[in-house]
Regions:
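Hinge/lid segment of periplasmic solute-binding proteins
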Residues: 20, 31, 35, 42-100, ...
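Short glycine- and hydrophobic/aromatic-rich loop-to-beta-strand nucleating segment
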Residues: 99-103, 108, 255-257
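Glycine-centered hinge/linker elements that transmit conformational signals in sensory
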Residues: 129-137, 166-199, 238
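A ligand-binding cleft/hinge motif common to bilobed small-molecule-binding domains
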Residues: 49-53, 218-234
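Early extracytoplasmic/lumenal segment of secretory-pathway proteins
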Residues: 1-47
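Short helix-initiation/N-cap motifs at beta->coil->alpha
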Residues: 11-28, 125-129, 194-207
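Extracytoplasmic/periplasmic substrate-recognition and gating elements
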Residues: 28, 229-300
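Paired acidic/hydrophobic, glycine-rich loop segments that form the ligand-binding mouth/hinge
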Residues: 40-43, 212-217
């Protein structure tokens, strides 16, 4: 309960697109649903957020009484992702997901002579330098990354043109660079072609997997790289972090208000508390090792 309001959770797994399928059906039935059965609030992820925010199923954040000033400490990219084609903000997140290059400290010391982040960054400062370092890693018995798929999101986050221009498919130069660089690395045996999340891809979470680096945000190393499994690199604090060749983000979860809700005031309060309250934001960082969508809090903790 929140006050005198009963909170009813609808939890659907992501497997086989079940979450989106269920959400689609429920939103389509929103208008005819009984008041207590209507969706008030729902979550979307970065990969499919625009599908929902660019429809009338989501309310503009301003309709809830939330102002631009309320969200002034949030990172702009988190707003861009949930802004519709008319320039209207349709969602808010408590989370930021900036990505870094996680490197195997032992491999760095063995091959590069140091595991200091500032020094390691010199070996991965741009893609040409990264690819040269891959040769050194191969000579020492390591793959630079587990898979060519590890770097795709970094390249694709740094495109300067759209996929479709004037009704024609367009391949950005940075995507073509990923294709060329990946083929060179794969042909040289300096990376693999495993699917992300596969068992083969995950072997590098352990020393015997002989993988130098992965790309990801805080949640990857905290929750997805076997950090709680004895014998893994993460279990022993064996991953370091460097900026890498290019900045990028991966993931994130946004709160959207459903059109038709009769609880706008409560949704406003939830969003403001969850995404703008400095004390709550700091607690999330300290308690969960997460990166929050509040530049004041993050800069303060960094200092």
């Amino acid at each position: 309960k929140i006050g005198d309001v009963d909170v009813v959770w609808n939890i659907t797994p992501n497997d086989d697109n079940a979450y989106q399928n269920n959400l689609d059906q429920t939103l389509q039935n929103q208008e005819s649903a009984a008041a207590d059965d209507k969706i008030d609030i729902f979550l979307v992820e970065a990969d499919y957020a625009f599908k929902y925010v660019d429809t009338d199923y989501t309310l503009p954040i301003t309709d809830l009484g939330i102002s631009e000033e309320d969200l002034s400490k949030q990172y702009q990219y988190t707003k861009d992702i949930v802004t519709d084609s008319n320039g209207t903000l349709k969602g808010v997140s408590w989370q930021g997901c900036p990505g870094v290059l996680f490197y195997n400290r032992d491999a760095a010391k063995e091959v590069l002579g140091t595991d200091d982040p500032a020094e390691v960054q010199k070996y991965v400062s741009d893609w040409d330098t990264f690819n040269e370092t891959a040769k050194k890693m191969k000579d020492a018995g390591y793959q630079m990354t587990s898979s060519a798929n590890d770097t795709y999101r970094v390249y694709s986050n740094n495109v300067t043109s759209k996929w479709v221009q004037d009704g024609k498919i367009n391949i950005d130069d940075n995507i073509m660079k990923w294709v060329d660089d990946s083929k060179e690395l794969v042909d040289a045996g300096e990376t693999g072609t495993h699917d992300l999340w596969s068992d083969d891809w995950s072997k590098g979470f352990y020393p015997e997997g002989k993988v130098f680096c992965y790309f990801g945000p805080a949640w990857l190393v905290n929750f997805s790289m076997a950090a709680d499994t004895e014998g893994s690199i993460g279990y022993n604090g064996g991953w370091g972090a460097a900026e890498g060749p290019q900045g990028f983000y991966w993931g994130g979860t946004w709160i959207c208000a459903a059109n038709g809700t009769d609880n706008k005031g409560l949704i406003k309060d939830i969003i403001l508390k969850m995404t703008t309250d400095d004390d709550i934001m700091k607690d999330i960082v300290v308690d969960d090792d997460d990166f929050v969508n509040n530049n004041k809090v993050m800069n303060g903790l960094a200092d």
